[in-house]
Amino acid sequence: MTFAIIETGGKQLKVEPGRYYDVDRLADDPDTKLSLNQVLLVHDGNEATVGQPLVKGATVEVTVMQHRRDRKIIVYKMQPKKKTRKKRGHRQELTRLMVDAIHLDGKALGAASTKKTKKSKASDEAVAVEAEVVAD
């Protein structure tokens, strides 16, 4: 199992290829590809490379999927015996990133697999059969 620990937005995340993660809002448009070079650790299944503080030559290739907002957090402040109450809500702005690949010294350690599920294979076959029928 290939994974890396990266730092983004002042927080550290353990990321794996082919999975998506929500991080603090980035100023990039959806469907853009980014290369994150704040990599603290890379593990390729057999060997771990630990940076001091960063791993030299390590990058994580990601794609911005969408911008979204987290669920609402209620902030309630009250002073007892004073009839003073404040109720506020907060929704954190997030960016959803899909991890495409982890690179170490220019070599891809892990890349998102493009496996097709049984359902998508069946639908592809159905589309091919329809195309043959239409062509006839």
Curated annotation (Swiss-Prot):
Keywords, sorted A to Z: Ribonucleoprotein, Ribosomal protein, RNA-binding, rRNA-binding
Keyword check for Membrane: no
User: What would you give as a GO molecular function for this chain, any one?
Assistant: structural constituent of ribosome
Superkingdom of the source? Bacteria
Gene Ontology CC: cytoplasm; ribonucleoprotein complex; ribosome
One GO biological process term: translation
State its role.
This protein binds to 23S rRNA in the presence of protein L20.
* HAMAP family membership: Ribosomal_bL21
Q: Which family does it belong to?
A: Belongs to the bacterial ribosomal protein bL21 family.
Listed NCBIfam families: L21
What assembly does the database describe for this protein?
Part of the 50S ribosomal subunit. Contacts protein L20.
Which protein are we looking at? Large ribosomal subunit protein bL21
